[in-house]
Amino acid sequence: MTGVQTCALPIYLRRHIRFLCAWLRWRKIWIDDLTRFDAIVPVPLHPARKRERGYNQSELIALEIGHMSGMVVMPKILRRVRFTSTQTKLGHDDRARNLENAFRADAVMAKGKRILLVDDVCTTGSTLGHCRDELLRAGAVSVEALVLAWVEKREVVGGG
């Protein structure tokens, strides 16, 4: 399969997150030992985007993983402080520029923490990289990421 690598399961966010996490556990697509992490942190949306959408899909996934694993979920440790344009049509360099200074981590909450960062999709890794850098800058000891899907290769559609 080329393009997006997924778990081959349709995701209808609010209604199916619990089922998806149970399915991941059943399929052994799961981190068996979450005890190496102190907190689960979802990639944040800007408050305006969250109001517009009505939910943060990464937060819903993180909350369900926390519920199933008994781990602490800390959605307030990382905030999106700058509204950014959508990333969907941007390449790696443009995504990186688009996300400069977009995130702030709470240094008191992050200090000394080993963090599992959760997102729904990883395309170029720019969002996860900026979040990781900000959490480490704020004093986190380590940051690892868990995503449900990633784009293996981004193909350009159209000519030019």
Give the predicted meaning of each segment.
Residues 8-117, 124-160:
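Conserved PRPP/pyrophosphate-binding segment of the phosphoribosyltransferase/PRPP-pathway fold
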